[in-house]
Amino acid sequence: MSSRPHPGSERPLHGPRQRFDLGTVVGRLMEEGAWQRGQRNSITLRKGEGMNVVLLVMKAGDRLEEHAALAPLSLSVREGRIRFVAEEEIVEAESDTLLTCDAGVRHTVVALSDAVCLLTIAG
């Protein structure tokens, strides 16, 4: 496993302490080509040592097809609105909402508006 997020990056993926200015990181994601072409974009902020953290920006209507994580997860909606469907339960979540689910729970995420989410996966 690499300790860097992208080839040539100076930012380590884990360490004893890390700090992120999420507003700045979101701004960078929205400047990148994927977002400009109407696609979702993401960056792994931390990976390893028992915790993976991904910042995700989604366009309205974007969808993460049904899948399951191998470990428990939390999804914090920072901006916008999403629909989270897990095991027949539908939850519409907006800014300042935290959702969690256990390992192996199949789920789908749909952006109801442009959205910013912070995904944390244990393990």
Please give the residue ranges for each predicted region.
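A cytosolic small-molecule/anion-sensing beta-strand core signal
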Residues: 78-79, 94-95, 113
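Conserved short histidine dyad/triad with adjacent acidic residue
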Residues: 35-39, 52-69, 103
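Ligand-binding loop in jelly-roll beta-barrel domains
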Residues: 92, 103-123
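Short acidic-glycine-tyrosine-enriched beta hairpin
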Residues: 87-103
